[in-house]
Amino acid sequence: MQISPEILPRIIQAIAEAIEKNAEAVTQLDQAIGDGDHVVNLQRGIHALQAQSAEIGQLDWAVVMQKIGMTLMSTVGGASGSLYGTLFVTIGKALRDKTADLPAFAAAFAQGVESVKLRGKADAGEKTMLDVLIPAAQSLQNSADASISLQELLADVTHAAETGVEATRKMLATKGRASFLGERSLGHIDAGAKTAQLMIAAIAAVIASSGAPT
């Protein structure tokens, strides 16, 4: 299965709508244990991508992933800009000179997540976006190797992200401002994990509705 980059403007728009719809709720999560500016910072990057969406849809996957990464690095404040920038730049490099099929995307996404782990000096279980990205990447790789339909694959990845974000509620924060709260960080969902889950769900919904072949 191959999907054209021409789908990216729709994906970017869907992400923008999902973050805007949930902005107040996510900001409340962030204010509880974080800095409270996560959504504002993230939306700055999303708006920059929206402004470039027509151009982005005409590039090949390797180039466009790196372009998205550099845009996020330069426009999103806080740790999120650096981490998401690293994710997409690494994906782009991994796709260079590759056929952009599902196994290649799964492998590239996994490499991107590994780069985020290194850049953020974090891993699963530390109440960060990685608690969504890691299981989503694992699910994508597992599903890419299995003989299942595209709809099943997307459902599996979406479910993995949902399970991951909910799991942060019971985690003790060890990164960022939330880490200073100690046990008071327990009982709260991580805002960065939540926006990662929202974006994965938005991406999956657009691909599912595109009628792309398996």
Where are each of the predicted segments found?
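N-terminal loops that bind phosphate or other acidic moieties
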Residues: M1-T214
